[in-house]
């Protein structure tokens, strides 16, 4: 055994051992409980960042802990490999996306191995391989046949220069992020997954997920957005619009129908298109509305604009004519693309009506405010429920009674009814991009849209493609899109759109169960491993990825592929990794962000940074505060450099000790140094045990006989007490306090009296074997080496988790706090099994009690078992 701790040598040896013995390769075993532990797989961007390292370290700690508890543990890894960054890199570096992606996978896989994660690499998947996306295409065709995938026109952000669709986040101030062109809203044919078919089930099943954070469940509940309300039909005819029909509107405030003074429609609504035909000014306004993003989030901050169409609809109750406006705050993709405007009781409608001088009619008087009229400025009471006024026969009805009465009258007229609506929209999965899974559909002039037959799957994405950033490369490749119709055999055109990359990540966790299956998407092994017992990832995935995964699992269930409905039993959302930021002001108000590694700081007595300067020139820099590690703020720490300097175990230990997993982790160089010092102390004690203490182990063991000297029995009791707490904390995912317990155990071992060498060696052997196993999930490399070097037997990967022994925790004598009139005055030692009367007698006879009672008789003596005695005089 080396005298000094050398992380590089220790970690290389451990990793080679794990690889040569296939230590983490698992198969199904019906005789053991299974534990499927999964961290969200990474996008192969090039290098791991510290957020990745924290995520995968937390998962690895859980996986290794459960393995030692006897579980059959699966911890796989793969690559979420399709996506736009690869296309951007292809343009910047003139390298095909496939080549860039596979090179990144190779590098990042090496980084993960260097960190010592207990991953079953035999199950590795990359979503950009035909072996993977073939089954995604296969499922697409099944869902299409079941009606869960359909095609319709969808509104997208269109960059007219780059000739491509932009995601909402790529639209900056109404312009394309790369071209700078004004973005247009366009309607194009797109494929949709009918997630709304599962809306009720997805919502109701949230109550059956006790292992999920309440915050995540609330976010999903709000995203699904179940609303009970009234569908209202506003009729129109030849005299009002030029044709007959009804304008449908959904409202959750049916009680306010009598206060509707206008209706507003989206720019893409058929009535808007009809009105614009002979109105150049309106047509120009509609074009303006079609520029910019289509995100719902934009609506809250954007300036509300509108224009009258000259069209009118009929109020279904009063028969009054209401003007139809085009408004930029109405989305075609939400509801019916139209709203009934009640300015007196909706803040957005109020602002719009005030701006354009439209009528404001109060029809609800809040029970909390006795106002007579609705007038500027807006107050929240205007939107509250209350008693109807100015509403004819509905006057004096309260909210629910009013909704019921109005809905009944609408139904009787055939102009509306109660219904439930969801905020959740069907999932548009078509992307006009290259680096994604090809949609397995063919367009035939005679047969329409035809799925690609199974025997022709996969539709392989060509990998040797030149990316220019303009238009879809696939749409410019006749060799890709020219094909025959699978039904009639006539010339047809292959779909050139690819799928949203969220599709790949919506089922990868199920493919891990049988990644080598060439005959099925998943096979019977999936029903052994699914669902995932513990899923770990950032809360930023609370809605899209996690909701899509829940939908996909149900869709696969209904196709007979899996037996489960929920993909993830327990969810842990780890906190962000943050670090200090520093910058200098440049000309024009720009900031030059400086990496913390290049900055020297001064701290006050509490450790707070009070001044900072750039190491290279000694000149001051501005302290920007603590923020999430990011490239933009240049405050990231390179995991590779950290591992090279300190070793993977130090990095893992710091990450686990610095904060509970669900809390924010603030980076600290001194904390890393502290973790390194602790591991050196652990190594030094292990070296002392292996080279010195072990030789003193007696043949007849005092531990078994219960004949330890009192001082060593106290040390042993302390070790088992800390172990008991650590086991409790592990179950609560409070890994930072597990490390605290390990540190306390090491302190106890280091201070243990050595005058009885044989007894000391026994306590050291038991205590150190507990410590090494306690650290094994967190710092597996040093634990592997010390377990072998100290002769504890076998491989620590196969070792059982330590459990506290009642015999070790048992005390013959305990010490109780002694209080007189509630004030701490000393302590008293009593037998562990002493009765109340004996404790009272010993307390009253103690020197401290005699001193502070001052000769006065006790009124009463209060004994709190195991804690204290309080003498009241």
Swiss-Prot record:
Keyword Ligase among UniProt keywords: yes
The places in or outside the cell where this protein is found are: Cytoplasm
Q: Which Pfam family, giving just one, matches this sequence?
A: tRNA-synt_1
Question: Which reaction(s) does the protein catalyse, per the Swiss-Prot or TrEMBL entry?
Answer: tRNA(Leu) + L-leucine + ATP = L-leucyl-tRNA(Leu) + AMP + diphosphate
GO molecular function per UniProt = aminoacyl-tRNA deacylase activity; ATP binding; leucine-tRNA ligase activity
Where is motif 'KMSKS' region found? 628-632
Motif window: 'HIGH' region: 42-52
Keywords in alphabetical order, please.
Answer: Aminoacyl-tRNA synthetase, ATP-binding, Cytoplasm, Ligase, Nucleotide-binding, Protein biosynthesis
Where along the chain is ATP bound? 631
GO terms for biological process?
A: leucyl-tRNA aminoacylation
Q: Name one GO cellular component term.
A: cytosol
Enzyme class of the recorded protein, top EC level: ligase
**Cystine bridges: which residues?**
none
Entry EC number(s): 6.1.1.4
Name of protein: Leucine--tRNA ligase
What is the native source organism of this protein? Azoarcus sp. (strain BH72)
């Amino acid at each position: 055994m080396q005298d000094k701790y050398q992380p590089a040598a220790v970690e290389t040896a451990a990793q080679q051992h794990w690889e040569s013995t296939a230590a983490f390769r698992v198969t199904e075993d019906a005789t053991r409980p299974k534990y499927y532990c999964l961290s969200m797989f990474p996008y192969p961007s090039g290098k791991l960042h510290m957020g990745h390292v924290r995520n995968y370290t937390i998962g690895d700690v859980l996986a290794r802990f459960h393995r030692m508890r006897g579980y059959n543990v699966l911890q796989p890894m793969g690559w979420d490999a399709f996506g736009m960054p690869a296309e951007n890199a292809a343009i910047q570096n003139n390298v095909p996306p496939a080549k860039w992606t596979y090179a990144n996978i190779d590098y990042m896989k090496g980084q993960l191995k260097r960190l010592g994660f207990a991953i079953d690499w035999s199950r590795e998947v990359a979503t950009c391989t035909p072996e993977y996306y073939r089954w995604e295409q296969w499922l697409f065709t099944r869902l299409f046949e079941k009606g869960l995938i359909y095609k319709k026109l969808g509104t997208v952000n269109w960059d007219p220069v780059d000739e491509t669709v932009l995601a909402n986040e790529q639209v900056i101030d109404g312009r394309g992020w790369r071209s700078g062109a004004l973005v247009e809203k366009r309607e194009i044919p797109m494929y949709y997954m009918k997630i709304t078919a599962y809306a009720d089930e997805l919502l109701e099943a949230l109550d059956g997920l006790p292992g999920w954070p309440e915050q995540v469940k609330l976010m999903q509940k709000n995203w699904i957005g179940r609303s009970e309300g009234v569908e209202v039909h506003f009729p129109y005819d030849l005299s009002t619009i030029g044709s007959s029909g009804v304008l449908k509107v959904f409202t959750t405030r049916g009680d306010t129908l009598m206060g509707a003074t206008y209706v507003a429609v989206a720019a893409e609504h058929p009535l808007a298109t009809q009105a614009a035909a002979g109105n150049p000014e309106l047509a120009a306004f509609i074009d303006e509305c079609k520029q910019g993003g289509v995100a719902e989030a934009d609506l809250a901050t954007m300036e509300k604009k509108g224009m009258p169409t000259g069209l009118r609809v009929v109020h279904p109750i009063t028969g009054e004519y209401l003007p139809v406006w085009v408004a930029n705050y109405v989305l075609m993709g939400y509801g019916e693309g139209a709203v009934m405007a009640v300015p007196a009781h909706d803040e957005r409608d109020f602002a719009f009506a005030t701006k354009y001088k439209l009528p404001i009619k109060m029809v609800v008087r809040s029970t909390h405010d006795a106002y007579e009229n609705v007038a500027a400025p807006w107050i929240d009471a205007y939107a509250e429920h209350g008693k109807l006024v100015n509403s004819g026969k509905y006057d004096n009805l309260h909210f629910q009674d009013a909704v019921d009465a109005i809905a009944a009258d609408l139904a009787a007229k055939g102009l509306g009814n109660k219904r439930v609506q969801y905020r959740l929209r069907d999932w548009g999965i078509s992307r006009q991009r290259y680096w994604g899974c090809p949609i397995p559909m063919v367009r035939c002039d005679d047969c329409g849209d035809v799925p690609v037959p199974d025997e022709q799957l996969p539709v392989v994405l060509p990998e040797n493609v030149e990316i220019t950033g303009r238009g879809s490369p696939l749409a410019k490749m006749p060799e890709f899109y020219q094909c025959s119709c699978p039904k009639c055999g006539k010339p047809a055109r292959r779909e050139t759109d690819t799928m949203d990359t969220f599709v790949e990540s919506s089922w990868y966790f199920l493919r891990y169960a049988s990644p080598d299956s060439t005959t099925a998407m998943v096979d019977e092994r999936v029903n052994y491993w699914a669902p995932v017992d513990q899923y770990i990832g950032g809360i930023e995935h609370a809605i899209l990825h996690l909701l899509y995964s829940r939908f996909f699992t149900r869709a696969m269930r209904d196709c007979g592929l899996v037996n489960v409905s929920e993909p993830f039993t327990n969810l842990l959302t780890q906190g962000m990794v943050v670090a200090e930021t520093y910058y200098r002001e440049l000309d024009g108000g720009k900031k030059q962000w400086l990496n913390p590694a290049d900055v020297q700081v001064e701290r006050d007595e509490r450790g707070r940074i009070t001044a900072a300067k750039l190491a290279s020139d000694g000149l001051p820099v501005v302290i920007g505060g603590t923020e999430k590690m990011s490239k933009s703020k240049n405050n990231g720490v390179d995991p590779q450099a950290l591992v090279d300097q300190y070793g993977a175990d130090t990095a893992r230990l710091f990450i686990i000790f610095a904060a509970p997993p669900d809390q924010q982790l603030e980076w600290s160089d001194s904390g890393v140094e502290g973790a390194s010092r602790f591991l050196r102390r652990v190594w030094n004690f292990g070296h002392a045990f292996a080279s010195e203490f072990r030789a003193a182990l007696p043949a007849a063991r005092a531990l078994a006989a219960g004949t330890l000297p009192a001082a060593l029995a106290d040390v042993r009791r302390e070790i088992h007490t800390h172990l008991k707490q650590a086991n409790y904390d592990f179950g609560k995912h409070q890994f930072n306090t597990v490390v605290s317990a390990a540190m306390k155990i090491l302190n106890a071992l280091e201070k243990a009296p050595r005058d009885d060498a044989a007894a000391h060696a026994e306590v050291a052997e038991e205590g150190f074997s507990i410590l090494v196993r306690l650290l094994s999930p967190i710092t597996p490399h040093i634990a592997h080496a010390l377990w072998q070097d100290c002769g504890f037997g076998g491989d620590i990967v196969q070792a059982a988790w330590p459990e506290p022994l009642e015999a070790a925790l048992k005390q013959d004598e305990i010490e109780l706090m002694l209080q007189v009139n509630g004030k701490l005055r000393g302590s008293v030692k009593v037998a562990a099994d002493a009765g109340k009367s004996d404790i009272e007698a010993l307390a009253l006879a103690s020197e401290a009690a005699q001193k502070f009672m001052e000769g006065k008789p006790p009124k009463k003596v209060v004994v709190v078992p195991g804690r204290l005695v309080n003498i009241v005089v």
